């Protein structure tokens, strides 16, 4: 059976299961005369079955949907960037294994294993009342399992280098169109579903604020800025051409084909530390910060996991922070907790 990508037109389609905070986002039907878009407004959602192979996003349908909002974004500008970021086999497997049902299943297995180990260990000691001992074992297993679940939930609130940050190139191409991409996943029946969100955001004010903030940090907090930027890096594998052996001095005497060719030999790979936000002019660094963490912001926005703010700069909701507030407080701030989930 063929797998067809689905398009959710934002406010007019059914509520995606992974967006409990949809009501907190500006919504509405496709715009009429005089209707304006607001920062944080969901434009459309592409949904595809992650259990099918091969798959691809129906970006043509998304392009048509964006045109109904008056946004002209040719899909060719970001098609390869989005699909190469999210649809590689290893990324799709990661999304499945990192889904909420898989985490729940792991927690159940963890509880059973911990309970059995604690119970078997307790049999070596005399605990008096058998039922009291069983209760203590159960409470200990439940406590450890709840701790594991809390660790999982805290991990989900960090920027995910395997999903969120892979959209940096696509978001960099879409910044000038006032659109940001974000990715979430859900499970429908036995199917893993990837959801690609298109959200409207005019980031010029955020760019200006972050430019000024980066310039100020370069002047008065340069060591802190360098420390925070040094954490914004990922490890990448790149292919390396094997060094050719030294041949005869006269190139005319060299054989046309190498003598010790091994067609089944695996290519050489090397790991490189790639800086996500390299040192540059403040405005360029501000745009790069927004591109890198735009996918992270959108995921937190559509799943209602953004930290509550007492005021906002560039969104209509007084309790929803804008991207520059999130980056200022949690990426460039003085907090000691790591913000990348690797």
UniProtKB/Swiss-Prot annotation:
It is found in: Cell membrane. It comes from the Eukaryota. The keyword Transmembrane helix applies. It is a multi-pass membrane protein. Its main location: membrane. The chain crosses the membrane at residues 105-125, 132-152. Residues 1-30 are annotated as: Disordered. GO terms for cellular component: plasma membrane. Keywords: Cell membrane, Membrane, Transmembrane, Transmembrane helix. Stabilizes cell surface expression of ITGAM and participates in the adhesion and migration of phagocytes during bacterial clearance. Interacts with ITGAM; this interaction inhibits ITGAM degradation via the endosome-lysosome pathway. Interacts with ITGB4; this interaction prevents ITGB4 degradation. PANTHER family: TRANSMEMBRANE PROTEIN 268, TRANSMEMBRANE PROTEIN C9ORF91. This is Transmembrane protein 268. The gene is TMEM268.
């Amino acid at each position: 059976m063929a797998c067809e990508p689905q398009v959710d037109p934002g406010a007019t389609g059914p509520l995606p299961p992974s967006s409990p905070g949809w009501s907190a986002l500006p919504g509405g039907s496709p715009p009429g005369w005089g209707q304006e878009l607001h920062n944080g407004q969901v434009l459309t959602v592409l949904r595809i079955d992650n259990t099918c192979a091969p798959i691809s996003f129906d970006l043509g349908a998304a392009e048509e949907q964006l045109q109904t909002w008056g946004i002209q974004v040719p899909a060719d500008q970001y098609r390869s960037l989005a699909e190469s970021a999210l649809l590689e086999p290893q990324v799709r497997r990661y999304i499945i294994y990192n889904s909420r049902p898989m985490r729940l299943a792991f927690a159940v297995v963890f509880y059973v294993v911990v309970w059995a180990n604690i119970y078997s260990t307790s049999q070596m000691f005399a605990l008096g009342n058998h039922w009291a001992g069983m209760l203590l074992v159960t409470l200990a297993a439940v406590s450890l399992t709840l701790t594991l679940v809390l660790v999982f939930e805290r991990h989900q609130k960090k920027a995910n280098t395997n999903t969120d940050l892979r959209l940096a190139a696509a978001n960099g191409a879409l910044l000038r169109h006032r659109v940001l991409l974000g990715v979430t996943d859900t499970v429908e029946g036995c199917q893993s579903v990837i959801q690609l969100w298109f959200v409207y955001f005019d980031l010029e004010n955020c760019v200006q604020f972050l430019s000024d903030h980066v310039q100020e940090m370069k002047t008065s907090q340069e060591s802190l800025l360098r420390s925070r930027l040094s954490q914004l890096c990922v490890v990448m594998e790149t292919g390396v051409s094997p060094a050719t052996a030294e041949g005869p001095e006269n190139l005319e005497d060299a054989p046309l084909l190498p003598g010790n060719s091994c067609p089944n030999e695996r290519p050489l790979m090397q790991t490189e530390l790639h800086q996500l936000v390299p040192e540059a002019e403040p405005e360029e660094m501000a745009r790069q910060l927004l591109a890198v963490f735009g996918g992270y912001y959108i995921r937190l926005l559509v799943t209602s996991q953004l930290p509550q703010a007492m005021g906002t700069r560039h969104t209509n909701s007084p309790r929803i922070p804008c991207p520059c507030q999130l980056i200022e407080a949690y990426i460039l701030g003085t907090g000691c907790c790591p913000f990348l989930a690797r």
